[in-house]
A protein has these predicted regions:
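Ankyrin-repeat-protein effector appendages
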Residues: 3-16, 165, 174-177, 181-220
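N-terminal segments that cap or nucleate solenoid repeat domains
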Residues: 8-47, 51
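Ankyrin repeat A-helix N-terminal signature
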Residues: 18-23, 51-57, 85-91, 116-122, ...
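Conserved ankyrin/ankyrin-like repeat signature
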Residues: 27, 59-60, 93-94, 124-125, ...
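Ankyrin repeat domain, specifically the short helix-to-loop turn at the C-terminus of the second helix
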Residues: 32-37, 62-71, 96-104, 127-135, ...
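Ankyrin repeat boundary signal
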Residues: 40-41, 72-75, 105-109, 136-139, ...
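Alpha-helical adaptor scaffolds
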Residues: 88, 109-111, 115-127, 131, ...
Length: 220
């Protein structure tokens, strides 16, 4: 269960925020022992765990995600969970703890931890998430796939991994762009060439560049 900022005094909120920011684990433990909730929300509606990732406060993060009472799936105001942020920052050991020991949600609706891992080209994190059942073609609110984010990152090995795990080249985002179009938009020439070659082998035709209109089924 998460606890709002209002449940704590402003002094406690300020002290905890500062302690997490500076990775002062002793102070964090002291405040929690004094009754401050480890599910406290701080700047920007961020859970302490998410804030710890943002501030690169590794000691504090490792401590917090190990506490049984911490809600690891509570998002910030942008819908980001600690697993998403740890994936974005390439924190594989923490990602493993969150999934294996805390049961953090991998396949949430919208943007997922896999999207976030692919955004910064974190191959090891993406590989691990896929091994744990992450949906390779998960769609964000804008119909962006992890493959599109991997293409933007420029990590060719990651792009290959996703394709080998079944990523669909034909998916287009809400603007009508495919992963191939994304490669060309972000000047990833080598990736674009490889994806076009793969397209021709799979679909026996040359790729015609986007964007293409995305068909939306009308309601009956």
């Amino acid at each position: 269960m998460s606890v709002s900022v209002a449940a704590q005094t402003q002094d406690q909120v300020d002290r905890m925020t500062k302690a997490v920011q500076f990775d002062d684990l002793a102070e964090v433990k002291k405040l929690i022992a004094a009754g401050v909730s480890p599910n406290l929300l701080v700047k920007g509606g961020n859970p302490l765990t998410v804030y710890a990732v943002r501030e690169k406060s590794k000691q504090t993060l490792d401590y917090l995600i190990g506490l049984k009472g911490v809600d690891v799936d509570h998002p910030n105001l942008s819908g980001e969970t600690v697993l998403m942020m740890a994936s974005l920052y390439g924190m594989l050991p923490e990602v493993k703890v969150l999934v294996d020991k805390r049961g953090a949600e991998i396949n949430k609706s919208g943007w997922t931890p896999l999207h976030y891992a692919c955004t910064e080209g974190h191959l090891a994190v993406a590989d691990y998430l896929l091994s744990k059942g992450a949906k390779v073609d998960a769609l964000s609110e804008s119909d962006t796939t992890p493959l599109m984010m991997a293409v933007r990152s420029g990590n060719i090995r990651l792009v290959r991994l996703l394709l080998d795990r079944g990523a669909d080249l034909q998916i287009r985002n809400h603007q009508g762009f495919s992963a191939i179009d994304v490669a060309e938009l972000f000047n990833q020439e080598e990736i674009s060439k490889g994806l076009r070659s793969r397209w021709e082998k799979l679909y026996k035709t040359k790729y015609e560049g986007g964007p293409k209109p995305v068909l939306v089924e009308s309601k009956p």
